[in-house]
A protein has these predicted regions:
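A structural/positional concept
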Residues: 8-14
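Hydrophobic/aromatic beta-strand patches that form the interior of the parallel beta-sheet core
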Residues: 9, 32, 112-117, 146-150
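NTP-dependent small-molecule kinase module
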Residues: 2, 15, 120-207
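A short acidic (Asp/Glu
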Residues: 19-22, 74-78, 160-161
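Extreme N-terminal, non-catalytic leader segments
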Residues: 1-8
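Short, structured coil segments at secondary-structure junctions
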Residues: 27, 110, 141-142
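Conserved substrate/cofactor phosphate-moiety recognition/catalytic segment
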Residues: 14-61
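ATP-dependent NMP and nucleoside kinases share a basic, alpha-helical "lid"
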Residues: 52-56, 62-138
């Protein structure tokens, strides 16, 4: 667990460039991009880990990181539950093993919070691509540490991200990554509809 004044938040999934640009203009937020693009063919875990390390040294109140060392784990978990093209657990286990090895070696630790852009305030319908690792097993591990911004337009998403950063809830730190992975192994997507513990933040109401 880090002990510094900056709150490190991973923005999970793909965020529009307009959202990142708008959030990056905030005086309270440092936008920490990876030094090497995640899709450049390099080590995605290493790129995300480096960004998280730099975020941990930021002096602003919040550091927003648009890459995640668990991104491949999240993608393979979602693919495992794709009823149209079922792939089984092999890829998930492979990516989980890579992430666990990097975590155990001290290459990264989980951020203070995860922030997820979603289309709905309904937890069962928040993911855009079916079962979602962040809204499912990760959130069930520590509900206070996964926040959701429910908006579809980039301008609303940017406002929602800034609003969410200012209303993050305190709570217990993450369990060991081994426990998170084990939760993912036994988590069934149908239980998404049964959980409403996430912090859901939508755009402000029009006046």
């Amino acid at each position: 667990m880090r002990r510094n004044s900056c709150t490190v938040v991973v923005l999970a999934g793909s965020a529009p460039g307009e959202v990142l640009a708008a959030v990056g203009r905030s005086m309270n937020v440092a936008l920490i991009r990876p030094e090497e693009p995640a899709d450049s063919g390099g080590d995605s875990i290493e790129a995300a880990a480096g960004a998280l390390q730099r975020a941990g040294r930021a002096t602003s109140p919040y550091a927003l990181v648009p890459v995640d060392p668990l991104a491949a784990v999240a993608a393979s978990w979602r693919a495992m539950w794709d009823v149209a093209q079922p792939q089984g657990p092999a890829e998930f286990e492979q990516e989980a093993a890579k992430a666990l090895a990097a975590w155990r070696a001290g290459r990264f630790e989980l951020p203070d919070y995860y922030l997820v852009l979603a289309r709905s305030t309904d937890a069962a319908d928040a993911g855009d691509h079916g079962p979602d690792f962040y809204l499912g097993p990760l959130r069930s591990s520590r509900p206070h540490r996964v926040a959701v911004v429910a908006a579809t337009e980039p301008a609303e998403q940017a406002v929602g991200v800034l609003q969410a950063l200012g209303s993050l809830r305190h709570g217990p730190w993450w369990p060991a990554l081994d426990e998170v992975i084990e939760t993912a192994r036994s988590f069934y997507p149908d239980s998404l509809a049964e959980s409403s513990a996430a912090r859901v933040v939508g755009p402000p109401a029009s006046s």
